[in-house]
Amino acid sequence: GYNIGDPFANEWRDTHVRITGEAVWELENGFVDFWNHFRPKTSPELPDQGARAWSADVTAQFNLPHNLLYPIRGMYIDAIERATDRVLITTAYFIPDREVLSSLIAAARRGVRVQVLIPEYSNHILADWVARPYYGELLREGVEIWLYQHAMVHSKTMTVDGRWSTIGTANIDRLSMRGNYEVCLQFFSRPLAARMEEIFANDLTTARRLTIDEWEKRSTLTRVGEVLLGPLEPLV
């Protein structure tokens, strides 16, 4: 969802989703579990009543660091590995671990069009720098990297093959995949995937594609910066 404040309304690009009906339980259940684990001792425990209905069309994945559970990372990898035609990713911070990187490259090698949309300049300059070493490997394998212009794209979304989508709080970086409390909804819905693809296509009109030629021509000073800042990746 959106951050709240004037800068986020005018200078950030985010994606919001509204859930109604039976699927609300997916988020409600996560809130109940989180509240009951971290609630103040003076506050009441919320009842855990179980699902009111079962549906595979909308499900939620929650990272729970206190239990060492990180299903969102597996959800991303599984969806990418299933792709046969296209993968469209939007993320604010893109620092994939080796398994996520390998799944993206494997998809591109089998003919899947993989497009990754990230901000050209995010609000975390260190995250921008430690992400850069991955660009060359991805570009050489045919993965498209698009740089969003004039605003901070903060969405965390992915669609696969026009049938599966996720919208949530998790970036593709170490903190989101292996550290933070995060929640992502996954949708098995062609209409929603089609809408997400329309939004992605519109976002590309405000982005520029990073080419392998441009990447290979970056300056020596830039390359030195990448090497020097690379060891700081575990911090972001």
Regions inferred by a protein language model and the residue ranges of each:
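Charged, low-complexity intrinsically disordered terminal segments
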Residues: 1-236
